Amino acid sequence: MFVFQYGGLSQLDSWDPKPNAPADLRGPYKPLATATPGFHVGELMPNLAAVSDKYCVIRSMSHRVPVHNVANEMLLAGSSSPRKDSPSLGSIITRLQPAHETMPSYVWLQKFGGGAAPAESAWLSGGFLGTSVSPLLIGEQHADNPATPGFRPTPFASAPELTTSRLEARRLLLQNTTSNSSNTAPDPAGTRLQQLQNRAFNLLQSNAAASAFHVDAEPEHVRDRYGRHPFGQNLLLARRLIEAGVRLVSVVAWMGLAPNDRFVSVETWDMHGNAGIGIFDNGWNGLGWALPRADASMATLLEDLDERGLLDSTLVVMAGEFGRTPRISRGASAIGRDHWPNCYSAMLAGAGIPGGAVYGASDETAAWVRDRPVSPEDFGATILATMGIDPRTRLSPDGFTLPASDGQPIFSP
């Protein structure tokens, strides 16, 4: 499960507080002790602080590109210089570890949007691996999420008159048309197309797949616990999908709108102060609104997975494309922090990741990596290795030139 803090979370105000830094750097939040001795987080994260034994924080993420779309493409591919047709890590996992035919292998909750969005080819196409390993997208529009009353996933929202028998009749008609149109030797591309068509029909007819998307089947107290906002309900949906057999779920961490806010974009974490909301304010684009909700929802997810016996077999990742500048600046209309890729933080949990751990270290202002830098390649290799995939697996179009990752896992699986 990969949670994208789209826009770039401030490391100083969350995972890597610096209480001894000058006032114009450290911000207003005090450090908060976690359940792990010697490990502190920002004070807006009390719920994650209480379950620190379930995750590891990397404080030494680093690259050199302060541009949203490019940095997002790097994060998606696990590469500092991805090709235009590089598959995302999600598509690689889908190719090597597909789900059962009656479940989608890869689901994406909440579409990237706004000026920070990576090219759709970087996450929706499957790259050179092809569209068969691209994700099933839920959340084309910002309101298309389980927190919206009456939510129903578009891929499963077929017309009432399209009964199971009519759908099966269409499948048979398609098969007959295909078989009658070719009297020659089977074409590999045509065979693959038929396989994909059959998989699509299986998904449409799968009660298990459709029911996994019904978040309203959850008890009200569970929905309340996750949070009645887009991010909380998407995390709950992600848990249901993983539990049902989906191999990978990506979630864009859009936290929804604060009271009286108008919709601007889903770039919650891009907190320059340019949207009329300061980074420390309580609007949709401020930490005062976004971080407590992310904290409560993520802590609930980790506890819920653990209680269900799923955490040991489920990798949970939370990261953005970069961090924020140590120095607080003035944006167009309020104060904020700007893009900072040189040193930032990410979280990993489950699937054998050591809990209660901090990997790497930053300097006294969280501006530069002091110890054990983690590149996009290393981060990607760590995800693959934790999923049981050898990063050296050859996946390039010719079958041997390019490995799945050029990085080194920071943990041994």
Can you describe what each PLM-predicted range is?
Residues 2-413:
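Ligand-binding pockets and gating/stacking loops
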